[in-house]
């Protein structure tokens, strides 16, 4: 989610070199919605889910019926550790650092406006960069389970810090079917399955350790595999590749210039992201599922 005070194309607020922020800065910040406002070419799942920042333009999260406060960083891995997964940019904020940032600056600001933590849902969806980077640096014949365990261990140690602040409702989303994507030929279905199984085991353990918490695990992998299996029912024309002109300023009005049909007819936005249309489809399923929980 792009913010007016964020690093362009990467974040809602700040970066590794601008790590701290004041409540005044956070509340003057606005969600930016346009072609480059997300990594999907349009609204993403948290914007669709909350209804906050869906329309083009600038949006104040406090004026949304469901407020959206996004502290994720584009291109982030879970762990910032030399020799494990590479830092994509020197300004990248890893998940561990994102949560440090939230604990130190985000939560105090939200407490200052009396955010009702009993009505807050903490959502965590990470792992695409982790699994891709591990196979890129170690090779597809490596044994990845220990690395996946390490990642999940660090995720939930960080989530523990959010729990300690008084948040009790958590949503975790597993990896999508990267094995069927255009940019990840080295990532196979067994890797994705292993990563997701280890993730689920850690989420279950977190639930068992905290009886006062509600842990929700959304299986987006199954949802999107089903969409891919029946893609024509959703209006998709291309589910194996992405439009090479996806990030061009005139792509929405002239996709044919790049040899493409409309972006909404593509499942994949680029080698590592789903289109906004795919996010919209999965979020409809997610919303119905959440209501039943």
Regions found by a protein language model. Name each.
Residues 1-293:
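Conserved active-site regions of diverse hydrolases
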